Each structure stands twice: as structure tokens, then as C-alpha cells.
Amino acid sequence: MFDPESLKKLAIEIVKKSIEAVFPDRAVKETLPKLNLDRVILVAVGKAAWRMAKAAYEVLGKKIRKGVVVTKYGHSEGPIDDFEIYEAGHPVPDENTIKTTRRVLELVDQLNENDTVLFLLSGGGSSLFELPLEGVSLEEIQKLTSALLKSGASIEEINTVRKHLSQVKGGRFAERVFPAKVVALVLSDVLGDRLDVIASGPAWPDSSTSEDALKVLEKYGIETSESVKRAILQETPKHLSNVEIHLIGNVQKVCDEAKSLAKEKGFNAEIITTSLDCEAREAGRFIASIMKEVKFKDRPLKKPAALIFGGETVVHVKGNGIGGRNQELALSAAIALEGIEGVILCSAGTDGTDGPTDAAGGIVDGSTAKTLKAMGEDPYQYLKNNDSYNALKKSGALLITGPTGTNVNDLIIGLIV
């Protein structure tokens, strides 16, 4: 029988080891030898860019003529021989984003039909790789991105707008590289692995239209300038002939690993979904309800059980607190699980960061909400104010891993004994 502390340690162990299964260096090293590449320009963009680039360098060495890496602040792990390594803003682009994107375009503008760009792409690329269309300022992009992120819009909707305001998104980067070829290795952080949505699809034909982008802005009541509206009307490319793409990792892989690890530990384990994409607090309440069903009725699984969920929820920010979707999901579940023994829920961003915080997510049990109440705090008020970070910090329920170097959505595990 597990005591609360050992159950907590086990949940964290399963989460961490599952994430290791989608470490980008492993996937890159497995894929590159099959591609017969020589004398390439390497461009790596995203939260996993550094590790992907390092692995590519270890495989290809001097076959890489030039390498440029663009990743999130704090995600570079040091120099790579003869590579230029930059860090930039996420989830909102900043001045460094613009500078580094210009640098990448300088490189590819010199290429001809005999050249190849090895494009290593991972989640976060929408913010880290950006150059607005003429007439649109960085400030306008920042304001619009922030509004979309707070609106509750899905990642597909957000990226539909982003693609229509960018010189590199929605297939425009591959269009700019032409007549050179793009060989892309993609680590997916998008449910369904849609290549036109991952990092806003810089090297894939865009299936969305200008009309779609305008409808998203209208749906969420987001005001924009006339210059932004004019820019959106410039349609993205719908056909590209110079692109070869390889998908090397996704949320299905991390969930499969979690299931396998839980079974090894003696749990009845099942993946409930890899497409969780509702409001974070609703997801927390829903997952808690299934955990209670297992706890008290032994269905849909008998105890000891491990319920595994993959996906990416959204948070419609109405309060002025701090947190992220995984922390909000965990806090919501903690409220629903209050007082129940032998249950634990761990919700984590596979990149090790959740919202604008230092936490990867939260790990809660039946005592989390009780701990807050014993301090004279109301957990529901924290949830209402979108202040999950401070609630979980006070109750000792934050999950802090540091940047993992990968990014394939979120992993949620519920253990019931």
C-alpha cells in the first residue's frame, strides 16, 4: 500500500521518465542517418531547438555549413561549435525575436537550387520565429498575441491569426527559401499533429485563409488597427514544392511511455485521451470525477489504477493572478478531490514550463485544498482569480522540473490506490 509521499514520488517519477521518451536528441539521432544529407544550412527554432541542434551536430558534424539556433530564454545549454545561438521571447515575441529571424532570412536568401536547409522545429516557434508583414509593428503583434492568449482561443485559432501577419509563418519561410530545399524534422506540440499549425507552419502550405483569421478576431472581440486588417488580407501560400517533413515526436509517444511505466509499477493503466483541449479548470474537475469513480466504484479501471491524459487545455484569463494551464487544472482537481485519500494528480507541461512561471505544473491530492483552508485561504478564490501558482506554492503542490529541452503538449496522470 502506498502512503501519500511515496505515491507522490511515483507520480513524479512516471511523469519525468515519460518525458524522457520524447527528448529531441534521441529522435533526431534516430532520424538523421536515414536522410543522406550533405552540406546543409541548419536552422533550429523552438523550445527544443538547442537539443535538436546539438544532436544534429553530433550526427552530421562538418556537413553543416552554418547553424543558427533560436530558443526561449533559459533554454540554451551552451555553445555548439560554429553555431550562432540566440534566445528570444515566449509566449510573446520581442526585439530579439525580430533580430534573430532577420538573421535567419539573411542566410537563406543567399541559397540556390543546390542548397538544403535542415529545419529543426518544435513548439514555441510561433513566438520565437517572427518578422511581421510590412506595415505591422512588433508592438501590434505583441498586443494582439497577448489578447489572443488571454481570450481562451485554441492554439489553432491563435496561429491562424499569427500566420496571416508574418513573413515566415504559414509556409512563407519555405517560400522564401525557394529554390533551395527544406528538410524539416518536427517535434509536435499540436493535438492531431497538424503541420500547418505546429509553430504556425513556417514550412508547410497553409490551409487557413485571411477570412478565417478575421473571423477569429471577431469571435473573441479583439480590436485591431486598420494596418493589421490590411495585412491579414495578404493570403498565405497554399502549395509548396520544396519541402520534405518528418514528424519525430508527439504527445501520443509520451502517453504510451507513461502507460508502460505505470503498468511496470503494478497499476491498471489506461490512456483516456491524447486530445484534451477544453478549459483547464473544467478538465481538472472532469479528471477528478473519473478518479472518484475509480476510487469508490472501481470503474472504468480497478484499483490500483493510473489514468493518463495528453493534450493542451486553455485558460480564459479573467483574474489578475499568476499561473498556467497545468497549475489551473491541478488546483481545480484539488478542490474536487478534497478529503479523499489514496489519490494523486500530476499535471505537467512537457517542456518544463507552465505559463509565465518557474513551474512545470502541479501535483495535488486530497489534502491540498484542506492545507489551504487550514491557512485561512479559500482555494476557489485563487482559482477564480487565475492565481493557481500562489495557491499551489502555499500548499506545497507546485511541480518544478526546470526546462526539459522538449515540448509535446501536456501530460496528466491520476493515480488511485
Curated annotation (Swiss-Prot):
GO molecular function, one term: ATP binding
GO CC list: cytoplasm
Keywords from the named record: ATP-binding, Kinase, Nucleotide-binding, Transferase
Reactions listed under catalytic activity: (R)-glycerate + ATP = (2R)-2-phosphoglycerate + ADP + H(+)
Name this protein carries in UniProt: D-glycerate 2-kinase
EC category name: transferase
Function according to Swiss-Prot or TrEMBL: Involved in the degradation of serine via 3-hydroxypyruvate. Catalyzes the ATP-dependent phosphorylation of D-glycerate to 2-phosphoglycerate.
Keyword Phosphoprotein: no
Family statement drawn from the similarity comment of this UniProt entry: Belongs to the glycerate kinase type-1 family.
Cofactor(s) listed: Mg(2+)
EC number: 2.7.1.165
Name of one Pfam family that matches: MOFRL
Subunit (UniProt): Homodimer.
Keyword ATP-binding: yes
Organism annotation: Thermotoga maritima (strain ATCC 43589 / DSM 3109 / JCM 10099 / NBRC 100826 / MSB8)
